[in-house]
Regions:
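Active-site-adjacent pocket scaffolds in enzyme catalytic domains
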Residues: 107, 114-213
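Aromatic/hydrophobic pocket-lining residues that form the small-molecule binding cavity
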Residues: 28, 32, 58, 90, ...
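Short, glycine/acidic-enriched loop or turn micro-motifs at the edges of active sites
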Residues: 10, 78, 218
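The substrate-binding groove and active-site-proximal loops of carbohydrate-active enzymes
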Residues: 19-26, 49-51, 78-90, 115-118, ...
Length: 257
């Protein structure tokens, strides 16, 4: 089972944190189009976890993704970490986000991912709130310790079912591998930049389950202070850009040749 997913909040964060620079909106639009084009070329469908605020303020972005045949999931309402919310705050946040996305695309939203994978042992009650609001699939668990959280007690690095007396959610945790005795993710975000493509591909091929995750910001050259393809090639010792690496991954692991 190979799953590709994207977390979509850049437009919303740009507007509310940086004032909404037109050139940044244009860049995000361009990279989203490149992603959707590659997924279409390879016959690949993904899940795009979107903040509810995007549905209210940038509905055209959400509808573009939905119209391309991809699943729209929820990524909270304003990208607030779940471990910073009380139960009551999460109830309000989740209801608002799910309702905004539902109204935007005209269909129910069933999948969820917490910003920064901010679900752990101390707030595992999150699943009860999500289930109450219609979530049936989740990908919020980082099953190891990390600088800001993680859920090492979860114990599973494969799809599982979270059960309680009134909750049943299918969980798709982030994939891990052992590096120098430490459990690390390898299939998305900054980790997709950290490891070589051959390393990532070999891990994927040895596993029956792989889930990758990206932000559009992850694919921008300036995220690493690199302004050109040549700088990228010198740093990673491979041809192209990080976007090219993502496309290569989609083609070889998910889509048709």
């Amino acid at each position: 089972m190979n799953i590709i997913s994207f977390d979509i909040e850049e437009w919303y964060i740009e507007k509310h944190k940086y004032g909404g620079r037109p050139e940044k909106y244009a860049e995000y639009d361009k990279y989203l189009d490149k992603i959707l084009e590659k997924l279409e070329q390879t016959g690949t469908k993904g899940t795009f976890f979107c903040v509810g605020g995007m549905a209210r303020e940038f509905p055209e972005v959400i509808r573009k993704i939905d119209n391309a045949g991809h699943e729209i999931g929820c990524h909270s309402d304003e990208h607030t970490w779940l471990n910073k919310m009380t139960r009551e705050q999460l109830e309000e946040d989740t209801h608002k986000a799910m309702d905004s996305l539902r109204q935007c695309i005209g269909k129910d939203v069933k999948s969820y991912r917490a910003p920064a994978f901010s679900v752990g042992k101390s707030n595992k009650w999150v699943f009860e709130v999500l289930y109450k609001n219609g979530v049936r699939k989740d990908s919020s668990i980082f099953p190891a310790s990390r600088d800001f959280g993680g859920f090492p007690e979860f114990g599973m690095v494969e799809p599982a079912v979270v059960l309680s007396s009134d909750t049943m959610i299918k969980e798709f945790p982030i994939c891990l591998t052992s590096v120098l005795g430490k459990q690390m993710a390898y299939s998305g975000g900054g980790y997709f930049r950290l490891f070589s493509y051959s390393f990532i591909k070999s891990k994927m091929e040895k596993s029956n389950y792989a889930i990758s995750y990206f932000h559009i910001n992850d694919l921008l050259p300036e995220k690493l202070g690199m302004k050109s393809k040549q700088e990228y090639e010198a740093y990673f010792k491979e041809k192209g850009t990080l976007l090219n690496r993502m496309k290569r991954y989609v083609k070889s692991n998910l889509g048709k040749a």
